[in-house]
Amino acid sequence: MRNNKQKGFSLIELLIVVAIILIIAAIAIPNLLRSKMAANEASAVASLRTYNTVIVSYSTTYGTDPSLDFSYLGPATTPSSTAADLVDSLLGAANPSKSGYNFTYTPGAVSNGIISQYSINAGPQSSSTGQRYFFTDQSGVIRQTTNGNPASSSSTPIG
């Protein structure tokens, strides 16, 4: 008499397990992506706050705002007006990018050789890294848009 009892899983059982795993993944992955996007947006806001703070520090120390780009705030062996060592190399690059956001510094009006106004824009690198655009200026107020256009001084302040 032969024993036909085989040990293991049938194809149907394996397909059911795979289907359950796919259903769980379909539920979890969008939530993870939204969480990553929210973290990128929070990082962009924190970076704008950092820029506002270090521009005030730079202005107090050197008597002017950075004249061209963020590299003036960046790392240095010996701090100077062209490399103040106020931010890390990510934020101190000429055209910084951090956590899926690109930052743009625009110096404004010059009075007696001193820049009295500036603006900073933060825009997502793609729609998967963030949906909100941010703006700040010498007032320190951070503003946002969600319509796909860069934020400006007339945009809604963040809460």
Question: Where do the protein language model's features map onto the residues?
Answer:
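A short acidic/small-residue loop/turn micro-motif
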Residues: G148-S152
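Aliphatic-rich helix starts adjacent to a transmembrane/signal segment
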Residues: N31-L48
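Residue-level signal for short amphipathic helical patches enriched in basic/charged
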Residues: I24-I27, A39, T61
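Alpha-helical hydrophobic helix detector
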Residues: L15-N31
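Extracellular/periplasmic head regions of type IV pilus-like filament subunits
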Residues: T53-Q131, T136-S139, T146, T156-G159
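N-terminal leader/signal peptides at the extreme start of proteins
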Residues: M1-L11
